[in-house]
Regions:
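Domain-level signal for soluble alpha/beta catalytic cores
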Residues: 1-213
């Protein structure tokens, strides 16, 4: 929705850049989601990680960008005139989406996720780790949440041609075996075609009580 509304040309950090160049657009999108009935909105921070920021230049530092995203979400809620709407922070893949294997070590991933949580924990109502492609990413974010003493909703993306496997090729069943004991608030499937979601959801239903897509 932001991409369709913005005059900016797409590039690897376009969603971040539009937040700086057209902040009112991002706030208005949050407002419109609230007016459409959303009771939880997610910060526009999918590309705000230390490794992704290395692709850009003349950008504010990580804490400032995260704060700016939170301010825009709150402005959108205020503009809607509604109350009782929660804000969650995005915990994305740290380097790029849909990678079979992250170039970062498990310890590096855990530390960076923990930093993102600690920088935002007092400004949001929760955390959504989204579009994770591998067991290592899921385990890292959940271990980081334990160290940060906070909860996190965990969302995996699965292969379009086989919804029982993560984008990494690993079995979704194996991912659940590793991640469910680490007590995510919920486990979700996202950023996959509907047919793949249909294949994966029964595995979630067996493994955990709180799941969705």
């Amino acid at each position: 929705l932001i991409r369709r509304s913005s005059a900016a040309k797409p590039h690897p950090l376009w969603s971040l850049q539009v937040m700086m160049d057209e902040p009112e657009l991002v706030a208005n999108v949050h407002r419109d989601f609230c007016l459409a009935g959303a009771r939880v909105i997610c910060l526009n921070t999918y590309s705000v990680t230390r490794h992704r920021l290395q692709m850009g230049s003349a950008l504010p530092d990580l804490p400032e960008l995260l704060k700016h995203a939170g301010d825009l979400a709150r402005a959108g809620i205020q503009a809607s005139g509604l109350s009782g709407i929660d804000i969650v922070a995005s915990l994305p893949p740290l380097t790029a989406s849909y990678l079979q294997q992250s170039p970062l070590s498990p310890e590096q991933m855990k530390d960076e996720y923990k930093e993102l949580m600690e920088l935002q924990r007092y400004h949001v109502d929760g955390f959504l780790a989204e579009t994770l492609s591998s067991i290592a990413e899921g385990e890292a974010v959940l271990l980081a949440a334990q160290e940060a003493d906070t909860g996190v909703h965990l969302a995996f993306t699965v292969q379009d041609e086989d919804g029982t496997r993560l984008r990494s090729g690993e079995l979704l069943e194996d991912a659940l075996r590793v991640c469910v004991p680490l007590k995510p608030l919920s486990i979700i499937l996202n950023c996959s075609v509907p047919e793949a979601i249909d294949q994966g959801l029964p595995l979630l239903a067996v493994a955990t009580k709180t799941f969705g897509a």
